């Protein structure tokens, strides 16, 4: 057994939109089931929630730069449905779509692969 990763191994990271994005009530984002659950008193330790989280929504450029600094080559992220469709269906939220478009542009600039 080798203790070394193969040369063609792709180092990457993964995130969940609820856990990192924050910006829970700006730019037209609707409420998710997790927003509702985490704001129900007694459901979450110390009544914590992800209203701000790591503020990836506002700091995505810094976050992508950090990924580049540690030489990641792949990034898997989830898309917040309530950010795209605030009412769950019907009309989409342009600001939500724009956020993910800008995030993808930033990832592509640094040749990070979205998985």
Describe each model-derived feature in a short phrase.
Residues 2-93, 97, 101-108:
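N-terminal structural segment of carbohydrate-active enzymes
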Residues 113-115:
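Conserved small/polar residues in nucleotide/adenosyl-binding loops
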